Amino acid sequence: MNEQFRQALSVIETLKRHGHEAYFVGGAVRDYLLQRPIGDIDIATSAHPQEVMAIFPRTVPVGIAHGTVMVIERGISYEVTTFRKEGRYEDYRRPKDVTFVRSLNEDLQRRDFTMNAIAMNEYGEIIDPFGGVEALKQRIIETVGDPAERFNEDALRMMRALRFVSQLGFSLSTETKQAIIRYGHLLQHIAVERIAVEFEKLLLGPFVSKAIALLVETNLFAYLPELATKKEELIKLSSYSLVPVDRIEAWARFAFVVHFHREQLKNWKLSNHLIRDILICLKALEHIRSLTDWTIDALYEYGPYIPHIERIRAAVYDDKPSVHSLLKQWEMLPIRNRKELAINGHDLLILFGKKGGPWLSEMIENIERAVLHRQVENEKEKLKEWAMCNQKRENNC
């Protein structure tokens, strides 16, 4: 048992002292067994939410209707959830009701995949009623019980399956894959925002190429926003070996390959801020196809986005990325954005004694370009002289 679990032991031990069962469950146990970095630690217990809140001094009822209470111990938050079973699902996405139970097995039985239905007690002993450990050894993603039932309960589980393929490099069991092929259309009942969360994780996984290939093989792509006609583009995307390093690069590379623009991205319900970043990368990639296309003007315009653009360019055009070299060139520019100019609009209004207007923005752009191309030093007095000279249209400015 590693240090993160040892820190959380006090929560388990406290619950047990009060006569309740308690176990580590979920992704943390799975990742511990895979010797991967562990995220948040979740605990399942026979104690009901009110009992949990009565036992611990610092709690937050984050999802009390579904049995979840946040317990804060030594400054660390743990989600403690009552053993439960779920009633009939509505709209292919959520149970109509949940019933608290006292059985760990019943709780594990409601989970999506066998690898996520493993529990661990305070001694580090594994409780695995559905063969999750063997699935981990075989590197297989399989549902708990009948995949048709699991996917009809919550259709988003099909996207989660492919997301785990991308993150872990596992394969789908034959039954799970066949069920995705058969029930993929149920994704149409799921909110785009929920799909986008899973799809983004898929795009960022180290085995994204494998997951994209499965997206095509299972025909699940046909039920994702704006992708029904993009089979060939997705096949092309699955051939790239470079793994995106962050969400901007992941979405921009995806959007570039499948020819998405603003409207298609908006239909994925992405934030305006993220869409802006993606569109900047797409604009650059329309012009920058080789290293020689990184002109001084391109470096200046896209500087902060160089790592994203260059890695996408290299992946798409089968080249080696030159991020470090380009960033050094960008850093050596006389200015890296307009705010670094030693003169501003107010200075120019005083200098020329004129009211603002189109002339002012044109003058600032001219000064900006002149400094960038080292036609004049970025010093206020020299810029004033250059501006006066430029205003008179003299050739020796």
Swiss-Prot record:
Binding residue positions for CTP: 27, 30, 111, 154, 157, 160, 163
Cysteines engaged in disulfide bonds, as pairs: none
EC numbers on record: 2.7.7.72
Domain of life: Bacteria
CC cofactor: Mg(2+)
Enzyme class: transferase
Organism: Anoxybacillus flavithermus (strain DSM 21510 / WK1)
Protein name: CCA-adding enzyme
